[in-house]
Amino acid sequence: MLLNFRLHPRLKEDCHLLGWLDRSYLLLSRNALFPWFILVPETEETEFHELEPIAQAELLDQINLLARFVATEYPIDKMNIGMIGNIVSQLHVHLVGRNHRDSCWPGVVWGYDGFKPYPPDEVERTVDRLIAAIPGRFRAWRAEATIRQK
């Protein structure tokens, strides 16, 4: 764990902070139109290819685990996975479950102006589903998270 690691302000603003998946922060986009999760590994590197091979393997494992969760828990036809970083240079991975009936299919979700907020209880249900689906690897964002973010 990096002692000085902080989430980029844009990620904090645009996402619900769910917890940690292994050594990565796990976020949920505030836009409930899509099951849109974001993994943020605790690293100072800004590009995937800059990570050590073991860190790359760990992140790929987390991506696969989270993708399986999304594919199991949501009615999706396609999983969009991307590491773009043009606006937020902090290394992060988008995992967006898509289906043929979503509001911007087949277009991309980036820059789409449709928005629907999550009801607070739905965010908590998502956390509970993650705890049940990924026991021992997902840790929910609780009091210790508030301390880490100060």
Q: Language-model segments: which ranges?
A:
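HIT superfamily nucleotide-processing domains
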Residues: 1-91, 95-150
